[in-house]
Amino acid sequence: MTNIRKTHPLIKIVNHTFIDLPAPSNISAWWNFGSLLGLCLAIQILTGLFLAMHYTSDTMTAFSSVTHICRDVNYGWLIRYMHANGASMFFICLFLHVGRGLYYGSYTYFETWNIGVILLFVVMATAFMGYVLPWGQMSFWGATVITNLLSAIPYIGTTLVEWIWGGFSVDKATLTRFFAFHFVLPFIIAALVMVHLLFLHETGSNNPSGLISDSDKIPFHPYYTIKDILGVLLLILALMTLVLFSPDLLGDPDNYTPANPLSTPPHIKPEWYFLFAYAILRSIPNKLGGVLALVFSILILMLFPLLHLSKQRSMMFRPLSQCMFWILVADLFTLTWIGGQPVEYPFITIGQLASVLYFTIILLILPTVSLIENKLLKW
């Protein structure tokens, strides 16, 4: 009798994805973040579902409903803070996952990579809309500032912004539609994840050496299921430590003040995971230029397959590229720090230099260094 695992139409798909999947024998802990992102998405959808049962998307009651969740709902505080800090964990895993892809040349799987970049955009949009829902000061002003950026689009800008707002300012209509989109987008993300995996399993996983590993594959289960469980335990440990000991560490105190259109906070800034892009946006004095730089700072990821001029796929044996990669990482940390600082000297200058360095490393220095390394191979 044949195993149901290998014959049943539905179970067969699960089998080919998580059990009998041939995986390279040498993939490191950097390959754990895909499964961790899946876990983060599951946590966010579950906690979000329970929050949506008690939340009201009305400007008069939104802030009070979040307070009610934290004070009166059974373990509401836990659900709310798991959702808020779960978003931070989601982005930490996302950045590490993308960084792994850049370092080991995983972007040469074009379809998988491009779906991944689209996923990054959709997750960022979802997180932005979620930040607006508690209707605190930073929610309101963050929504006002970021949606207003679209007015920089020539000719249709102003109409587009008013269309998104559903009026002449961020108000009840905006909050309601943001809630609707914030609810539905995670399910679209889940569908995109399926497509992401579909394309990945067409080619098989990359590995740290960047070499073809068809001759040395091992089954996903039990080797990588056990390895993933370790990652899962560490992620849950980190998340619950944050939630139970310092739930407001990554939040903004201004968001504990109800939204007031008549009082602008002294420093409007997004959540920490958007600060690097926000710093790039602010480093350009022109509004349209800033918006284009903001979009391109993420969209540039799609150019990596075209900018790959090295004869080797991975950076494992390319010390010059490694050096530039870690300078790029340091530059992103600098941009994140600058994004949270007020717009004044010397932060403006540092932000502009860091922004120029970001684009220069990706568009110019990394490809040039790759060509130099190709020459060194002949010595």
Curated annotation (Swiss-Prot):
Quote the record's cofactor note: Binds 2 heme b groups non-covalently.
The cellular location(s) given in this protein's UniProt record come to:
Mitochondrion inner membrane
Q: What is this protein called?
A: Cytochrome b
Residues given in the record as heme b b566 binding sites? H97, H196
Record's InterPro entries? Cyt_b/b6_C, Cyt_b/b6_C_sf, Cyt_b/b6_N, Cytb/b6-like_sf, Cytochrome_b, Cytochrome_b_C_euk/bac, Cytochrome_b_N_euk/bac, Di-haem_cyt_TM
Instruction: Provide the membrane topology annotation.
Output: Multi-pass membrane protein
Task: Add the further remark from the entry.
Answer: Heme 1 (or BL or b562) is low-potential and absorbs at about 562 nm, and heme 2 (or BH or b566) is high-potential and absorbs at about 566 nm.
PANTHER family per UniProt: CYTOCHROME B
List GO terms (cellular component aspect): mitochondrial inner membrane; respiratory chain complex III
GO MF, one example: ubiquinol-cytochrome-c reductase activity
The organism named in the record is Urocitellus armatus
**Tree of life domain:** Eukaryota
Question: Into which family does the record put it?
Answer: Belongs to the cytochrome b family.
Q: Per UniProt, where does heme b b562 bind?
A: H83, H182
Report TM segments.
33-53, 77-98, 113-133, 178-198, 226-246, 288-308, 320-340, 347-367
Q: Which residues bind a ubiquinone?
A: H201
Mention one GO biological process in which this protein takes part, according to its record.
mitochondrial electron transport, ubiquinol to cytochrome c
| Function, as annotated | Component of the ubiquinol-cytochrome c reductase complex (complex III or cytochrome b-c1 complex) that is part of the mitochondrial respiratory chain. The b-c1 complex mediates electron transfer from ubiquinol to cytochrome c. Contributes to the generation of a proton gradient across the mitochondrial membrane that is then used for ATP synthesis.
Question: What keyword terms does UniProt attach to this protein?
Answer: Electron transport, Heme, Iron, Membrane, Metal-binding, Mitochondrion, Mitochondrion inner membrane, Respiratory chain, Transmembrane, Transmembrane helix, Transport, Ubiquinone
